[in-house]
Amino acid sequence: MTGARKKSDFLCCGLDIKSYLCPVKINKQEINPLKEYSNYNYFNNMNDKKLMNLAADNIRILAASMVEKANSGHPGGAMGGADFVNVLFSEFLVYDPENPAWEGRDRFFLDPGHMSPMLYSTLALAGKFTLDELKEFRQWGSPTPGHPERDIMRGIENTSGPLGQGHTFAVGAAIAAKFMKARFEEVMNQTIYAYISDGGIQEEISQGAGRIAGALGLDNLIMFYDANDIQLSTETKDVTIEDTAKKYEAWGWKVIKIDGNDADAIRGALNEAKAEAERPTLIIGHTVMGKGARKADGSSYEANCATHGAPLGGDAYVNTIKNLGGNPENPFTVFPEVAELYAKRAAELKSIMAEKYAVKAAWAKANPEKAAKLELFFSGKAPEVNWAAIEQKANVATRAASATVLSALATQVENMVDRKSVV
């Protein structure tokens, strides 16, 4: 099925379109269809697994080819993570392709910036980058640098720097989303997604982010942990023995373990995570570094540290592209079936956005003051601040001076969220 859903599409599962906006029970689980409107997963057959695998392979081909052409980059992780980003972008992530800055959009944060070829390739399928721009990967002045730089209009929510920082971006965004939903109800009801990796899990900054997310019960936060067990020069087991699942469970997270290269398992985990109403969710996806890669002699190049941070090179690259169904002579290609898959999602998003904007219009009519405030919050305009009212005492500690300023701002800037740790 392609394009927007019709009323008849919902009758096959016993739902009249009028009951669509009311909670229903499916498999003994109460589902709010309005909340699940983003992906139709409870109302429609999913994309064929063969097609989903083809799309993931297309992403792998593009990612490996970007690194090969640049003679620099990280192909292995991007190839292993292709299945998750494909399911997310082709079935779950809600955004307005015609208005990427729409305030109610879902957010996707990529922590391991070195896996940028995966993100750029997926965004190319979604129409945000051209194939020629993918060919410019890591070139001076190109829109596809080695680590992504924030560009909302192209679907990039964050600049990816040190590993672990993406955890904090996502948690902060989830807190902000809760803040906004408390004030603007159904028009700010987005999900925050994050993609993290073994390297980010090892960084201490991710620990604090994980703890506060669990403590706050951020059920609007879903993190996919790409657990390929490979790092720059060794397997992760050589440097760590901790149980990541138990650690996050101790912090108050829901943890789901899956095969991270299985589209059906990914979809099921995302549905389960979206239904969670009390805790953030960590999906531990056990993936294969360099999924589909082949060596020069044709043997498997998967789960090999050598694919982490260097081009596949020579015959290994040629054999890999052939193994994935591509043409080494013309690798920067989108398969027709994959183009259709993403065109279908674009049509779905158009229908979703029509509904979202209708809800917003009705809400704004009923809540004009709140609607004006929402517009102001996203206008980029700074409020008037009475700096003269801030009185500092002599010889106070910098943390005390900072607290004085923040306290003054908190009473004058409505959309500021601030918390301080004890040091």
Question: Where in this protein do the model-derived segments appear?
Answer:
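Cationic, amphipathic, low-complexity segments that mediate targeting or membrane/lipid association
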Residues: 1-5, 9
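Short, positively charged and aromatic/hydrophobic N-terminal segments
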Residues: 10, 20-25, 34-42
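A short glycine/serine-rich beta->alpha loop
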Residues: 49-52, 66-75, 103-111, 153-164, ...
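N-terminal capping segment at the start of a domain
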Residues: 56-72, 225-228
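Cofactor-binding active-site loop characterized by glycine-rich and histidine/acidic residues
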Residues: 80-216, 415-419, 423
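Glycine-rich ThDP/TPP pyrophosphate-binding loop and its adjacent helix/strand module
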Residues: 97-98, 152-153, 158-342
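N-terminal leader/propeptide and maturation segments of large enzyme subunits in energy/redox metabolism
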Residues: 325-388
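Non-catalytic terminal/interface segments that mediate subunit docking, oligomerization
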Residues: 360-423
